A protein has these predicted regions:
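Conserved small-residue
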Residues: 1, 21, 28, 57, ...
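Conserved catalytic cysteine-centered active-site region
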Residues: 1-27, 59-85
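Non-catalytic positions within long, well-ordered alpha-helices that form the structural scaffold/packing
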Residues: 29-33, 41
């Protein structure tokens, strides 16, 4: 993308499985915060609908076996959950410093005030709640907030018994 659109400055390709897009946004936020860039594109994509992807998730028993509409099959945190439905997609955000956005008269839709990440070194598909808790504490600390200040959590619900456990 940088070559095609002439984007210059810091760039990297983040590869952290399900957290790739979020890590890309968080790292871009930090680079802007540190003054390494005024604006950055950040996002992720997923393209696992392939023989390898389907075979791997089927072998791990992570795919839903329900015979219903895909929108009804994947049920994160539901007692009757039995796996997810594969899909593909991509998303990219333009992040920039507040000063840069104001200078160009941008419509500001949101502000990132903190970011945290943590590896739990536990299991590839069964996250450990200690690592998850540490990640949230890191984000709160970075934002200068307390847990009482949080009104929304975007959970990683895989609709699998093991993935939704913690």
């Amino acid at each position: 993308l940088s070559i095609k659109y002439g984007l210059k400055g810091p760039n990297l390709a983040t590869v952290t499985a399900c957290t790739t897009g979020l890590h890309s946004v968080g790292l871009a936020y930090r680079m802007i915060q540190m003054g390494d860039a005024e604006a950055m594109l950040a996002g992720g994509s997923e393209a696992t609908v392939s023989p390898l992807g389907i075979g791997g998730f089927a072998a791990a028993r992570a795919l839903s076996t329900r015979d219903c509409a895909p929108s009804e099959a994947s049920r994160p945190f539901d007692k009757r959950r039995d796996g997810f439905v594969l899909g593909e997609g991509a998303g990219v955000l333009l992040l920039e410093s507040y000063e840069s956005a104001k200078r160009r008269g941008a419509n500001i839709y949101a502000e990132i005030v903190g970011f945290g990440m943590s590896g739990d070194a536990y299991h590839m598909t069964s996250p450990d709640k200690i690592g998850t808790s540490r990640c949230m504490q890191n984000a709160l600390s970075n934002a200068g907030l307390n847990q009482e200040d949080v009104c929304y959590i975007n959970a990683h619900g895989t609709s699998t018994q093991i993935g939704d456990k913690n």
